[in-house]
Amino acid sequence: MKNIIVTCFFVLMQLGILVHAQTNTTTDIYQKSQDGYACFRIPAIVKSKAGTLLAFAEARKNSCSDTGNIDLVVKRSEDGGKTWSRIITVWDDGDNVCGNPSPIVDQETGRIILVSCWNLGEDHEKQIIDKTSKDSRRVYVLYSDNDGKSWSTPKEITSSVKHPDWTWYATGPCHGIQLQGKKNKGRLVVAANHMVAGTKTYHSQLIYSDDKGETWKLGGIVNEHGGNESSVVELKNGYLMLNMRNYNREESKTRSYAISKDGGETVSQMSYLPELIEPICQGSTLNYMKKGKISNNILF
């Protein structure tokens, strides 16, 4: 792919989430065994319309396990990442799992929309996939109208974005986007993945909202298997690129991608990016903005 800047990085969430300032100093945003939590994982960060940095994470109460008591939290920085606020609880549902943050900033209203997932704390991913769990994965949306200082009650949107025969489901984990192109300007788009009942293979998909996050629709689904944790970026030509963690190692040991030409409603066949070798890991995708406009440069 031409005119693409590729920056590969892997964030080790077990020890903490780091922000690198221009002075080459580091600030620990989250550290394990602090603030009443054993571990912090699954990061997402956005800049609000007011310029505040919002760093989301799963706050895992008792261990680094993917199951059990997991809360969604955020920290705020009003000075470009030099200092950070105390932990703000976005969603705490007792002993259950609240996770996979996918935040989006509405640049028109300033509202911060957060799409995320839930499951019973006692249900493990394998049980959910095998349909032996007590419940399943559910999808919710929350929002903040005061720059991330407080958050709404979660609203369930599962029936709008998840087929009944899907077992596992996960949003992101990464930021979502608000489209800038003329055709679908203002649309909110989030990348996600799922598994169909009776199978053991992941597929990626897009979900979108045309009313500022009030209602959501299921968009394009990648037919080829292997796509897992995903991120989405808007390209200069108005297309969207869905970039995916790849479990189909027989095809390629690199990240995979698919293109949407209609704002996320449908997606192309899966292809692979030979430049992006990965060990099956979450990865973020960003468009490098130039003078406030979308450019040809993409950061991975």
Residue ranges and their predicted role:
Residues M1-N24:
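Bacterial Sec-dependent N-terminal signal peptides
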Residues Q22-F300:
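Asp-box/BNR beta-propeller blade signature and adjacent active/binding-site loops
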